[in-house]
């Protein structure tokens, strides 16, 4: 059992099969100089906010952003902004990054994962934006299972583009469900390869 510090429907769907409850963090997102610093900082802020309220429970927090042309993009403020962004990304490859934090009290496991996303050359942007709420998604878009009218190719984790890198999270969450890990002292190695204690 853990707490998901997000109200994202996409993340809740990805976590089906796991026992969790939702407690949105209510944290205002910040921007840093790099995609990794931005995503990881926001995920840590979200995890901290919820972990302070529930210090004995595991908290899962995440933040997803898009980087293109030297700029970092989160959720567009409205449909017009989403249309402008998607037109700029059309036919191009951009980087989507997700910072993930799994935290219990003061102890954190941190992961940052990127995927490369290439859009079609001339996607029906207005139609896509009209039938979804682009203000709920980083970059202003969600992906379909098949025949996506917007996305031509994804290099890397597909679930990461949806909202969580499940290839990395799944074994970790299963391990937490099987075991009741004792607190890990700062500075000791994490018994899960590929994760960082910070």
Regions of interest found by a model, annotated:
Residues 9, 27, 107:
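Short, glycine/serine-rich, charged loops/turns that create anion-binding
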Residues 24-31:
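Short, acidic/turn-prone active-site loops that include or flank metal/cofactor-
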Residues 1-20, 24:
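N-terminal beta1-alpha1 ligand-phosphate binding loop
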Residues 2-3, 34-198:
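Anionic-ligand binding patches
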